[in-house]
């Protein structure tokens, strides 16, 4: 078995240790997608949206829908900014096509969360 050869460093570098620098990639800030309560959007439609656009199970969707209904808002999911904004646009367009005033917003998560 042959050993791989390591190319020599620059001239005059014999016997010196070469340091490689690593840059750390900062994780992107996360955004919450919130569904906001209104008096007109049917609860079953909110459940359908959560299942279709946020891949929630029926049970998860019902719990989030109840939070929206009782607390005024519920967290549909937490994503990077681009994904969160896309979800907001998709759900808003779908709700408008279906004739529902469902409001969806994205907000940055707090740094400590």
Curated annotation (Swiss-Prot):
Gene3D superfamilies: 3.30.1390.10. SUPFAM superfamilies: ClpS-like (SSF54736). It comes from the Bacteria. Residues 1-24, 92-113 are annotated as: Disordered. Residues 1-11 have a biased composition (Pro residues). Signal peptide: none annotated. One of its GO terms (biological process) is protein catabolic process. Belongs to the ClpS family. Involved in the modulation of the specificity of the ClpAP-mediated ATP-dependent protein degradation. NCBIfam families: PRK00033.1-5. Binds to the N-terminal domain of the chaperone ClpA. This is ATP-dependent Clp protease adapter protein ClpS.
